[in-house]
Curated annotation (Swiss-Prot):
Keywords: Ciliopathy, Cytoplasm, Disease variant. Belongs to the dynein light chain Tctex-type family. Light chain of the cytoplasmic dynein complex 2, a multisubunit complex composed at least of eleven different proteins. The cytoplasmic dynein 2 complex consists of two catalytic heavy chains (HCs) and a number of non-catalytic subunits presented by intermediate chains (ICs), light intermediate chains (LICs) and light chains (LCs). InterPro entries: Tctex-1-like (IPR005334), Tctex-1-like_sf (IPR038586). One of its GO terms (cellular component) is dynein axonemal particle. It holds the Pfam family Tctex-1. It is found in: Dynein axonemal particle. This is Dynein light chain Tctex-type protein 2B. It comes from the Eukaryota. It is linked to Short-rib thoracic dysplasia 17 with or without polydactyly: A form of short-rib thoracic dysplasia, a group of autosomal recessive ciliopathies that are characterized by a constricted thoracic cage, short ribs, shortened tubular bones, and a 'trident' appearance of the acetabular roof. Polydactyly is variably present. Non-skeletal involvement can include cleft lip/palate as well as anomalies of major organs such as the brain, eye, heart, kidneys, liver, pancreas, intestines, and genitalia.
Amino acid sequence: MATSIGVSFSVGDGVPEAEKNAGEPENTYILRPVFQQRFRPSVVKDCIHAVLKEELANAEYSPEEMPQLTKHLSENIKDKLKEMGFDRYKMVVQVVIGEQRGEGVFMASRCFWDADTDNYTHDVFMNDSLFCVVAAFGCFYY
């Protein structure tokens, strides 16, 4: 009675492509983000929750489809976070999907980062067939 769990990571640097190619170099001496552009866990969690409700509301667990779904979710969430204006943040989105069988799952993450600028949030979605845990990490790019 084996359980299959899909895991996907998606990494982005938080800067829209249009701004990267603007031709003007970005200041590298900025050591702290502007207050309005700091990674805000509560806002990010609301964004993640909305995406999960939309994408997984009627989803059924299928081991063959889960790798593609985890990749799609991680990229979709990463793209939504980029649109939120967290300039100079590298976004890491981790998505874990597993079959809902009434068993428990323990998950943990460890990071080495700057506690003044970097942060994370997570959200859990469950239905009768599956569970999904999403963790989003925002690391300021110096």
